[in-house]
Amino acid sequence: MLPPIILSIAGSDCSGGAGIQADIKTISALGGYAASVITAVTAQNTLGVQSVYPIPADMVKAQITSVMDDLRPDAVKIGMVHDASIVTTIVDCLQTYTPECIVYDPVMISTSGRRLMTEETIQVIKTELFPLCTLITPNLNEASLLWGQTITGTVEMRQAAQELSCRYNTAILVKGGHLEGNDMCDVLYCRQPSAGADVLPSGCILYSNPKIESRNLHGTGCTLSSAIATFLAGGNKLDEAVCKAKEYIGTAINRGKDMNIGHGNGPL
């Protein structure tokens, strides 16, 4: 039996903690087969991003075409796409090949709060890419930007998830890892939860786990989204895939919390 095939479309992290490298490691660890399309080459490490070199849009298209024509992935995970022309290229390819599952981790804002793409690119993403996605996984800053209001707690997370889902006709997972408190809370809004899902009156599903203190969290968003894509490719319903992916992330954080790789925010 063939393993599920997952295509990651994202940037390269030379230090191995995030981006394509984190996606490949995650997909492989969960029993999938990882293919990759690189949208940008970054010079970065645990201390930060030093330089970014965008891959030309025609080369991004060539990579996607090569993978799609031969492998036909069961799911696609999209990460760093900070140029409008690359977004349009990806959208054109997705419309041509129509993969069943598309998970997008919108890398729009850095950890320090700096925007990583222009307003033009954000608008193209909103109007062209979002409607094609199965799931979008913004963190608090990104969800606040998309929603137009600051999110400070789980009440706003639920409101944002529901309204963004209706606005863009896709499922939304708002990640609350940066919330104050002892728990790590994420909120999912999807149209068709599984029969056993614990759905709130708002229609949202709240995932809450004790927060694990660790300096090794670089690549957490990449790992979560690629894990969700892998579980979706394996036949899980969306809320089940999110639940399993969060369990995987929790285990990874706990097992790696005492490691010392690099001098800054270490890899997950």
What are these regions (language model features)?
Residues 2-8, 28-111:
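Conserved N-terminal subdomain of the carbohydrate kinase-like
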Residues 9-15, 204-219:
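Short pre-catalytic strand/loop immediately N-terminal to key active-site residues, enriched for Gly-Thr
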Residues 16-32:
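N-terminal basic/disordered segments at the start of proteins
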Residues 30-35, 199-206, 231-245:
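Phosphate-handling active-site elements
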Residues 54, 239-268:
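Charged C-terminal helix
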Residues 119-204:
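Conserved phosphate/ATP/ADP-binding segment of small-molecule kinases
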Residues 144-145, 214-238:
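Short, small-residue alpha-helix embedded
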Residues 157-165, 205, 237-253:
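Short, well-structured alpha-helical segments that form the helix of a local strand-helix-strand
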